[in-house]
């Protein structure tokens, strides 16, 4: 087995096959109110807060920011509570890491209550020391301090790996000195070549990850 003492996992697009909800949530919100959306992937393009502000202005919504936020949260809560699926091979890989004494934690942009619900429903919450929402702590994955915060939260030492699907987070983790496993996800297809250049190993699936770590 390759040396690994602790692992920091992203959730959406890495542990869960769930990125499409961020491509459709804004459109679903509008359609539920009888509005035909001009585009569906606002949050991917603009981020969550900017996307909400854009929706209010562009579609002349007679709603406050918080009202739109609450409506979107209902959509997301339903999705993570009932639908968001685990990626193939994840549970088997996590069990192998646990069997070898590897500490694990989740660092996600999703709200912690939603993340924990989805991980619990998929039977993998118990593998992790904690689930940390970067949005809730106010440090995002474009800042190397985010990964140090998460590492310190589980009192980890030794060789650490970050498991990520998004290029910007991969670049940040590398700049912070971490080894990085790039997990393939459709949502980052345009960045695939650049991702491969920046990771220690690029995996199309978790069977390949297991082989990389000689598990």
For the regions a protein language model found, what residue spans apply to each?
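Asp-based, Mg2+/Mn2+-dependent phosphohydrolase catalytic module
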Residues: 1-5, 95-98, 112, 116-215
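N-terminal helical cap/lid subdomain that shapes the substrate entry/recognition surface
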Residues: 2-91, 98-100
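Conserved phosphate-coupling serine/threonine residues in phosphotransfer and NTP-handling enzymes
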Residues: 14, 108-110, 184
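Conserved SAM-binding loop
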Residues: 15, 104-107, 139, 162-163
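Short beta->alpha linker loops
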Residues: 21, 43-47, 85-89, 110, ...
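N-terminal start-of-chain detector that recognizes signal peptides
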Residues: 75-78, 103-106, 133-135, 174-176
């Amino acid at each position: 087995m390759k040396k690994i003492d602790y692992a920091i996992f992203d959730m959406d697009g890495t542990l869960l096959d769930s990125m499409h909800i961020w491509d459709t949530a804004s459109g679903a919100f509008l359609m539920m109110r009888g509005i035909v959306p001009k585009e569906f992937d606002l949050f991917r393009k603009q981020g969550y807060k900017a996307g909400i502000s854009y929706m209010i202005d562009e579609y002349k919504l007679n709603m406050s920011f918080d009202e739109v936020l609450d409506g979107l949260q209902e959509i997301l809560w339903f999705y993570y509570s009932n639908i968001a699926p685990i990626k193939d091979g994840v549970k088997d890989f996590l069990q192998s890491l646990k069997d070898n004494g590897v500490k694990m934690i989740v660092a996600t942009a999703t709200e912690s209550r939603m993340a924990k619900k989805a991980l619990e429903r998929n039977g993998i919450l118990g593998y992790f020391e904690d689930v940390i929402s970067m949005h809730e702590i106010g440090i995002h994955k474009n800042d190397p301090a985010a990964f140090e915060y998460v590492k310190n939260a589980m009192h980890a030492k030794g060789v650490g790996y970050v498991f990520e699907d998004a290029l910007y987070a991969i670049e940040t983790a590398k700049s912070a000195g971490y080894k990085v496993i790039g997990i393939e996800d459709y949502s980052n297809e345009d960045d695939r070549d650049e991702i491969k250049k920046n990771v220690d190993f690029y995996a199309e699936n978790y069977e390949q990850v297991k082989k990389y770590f000689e598990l």
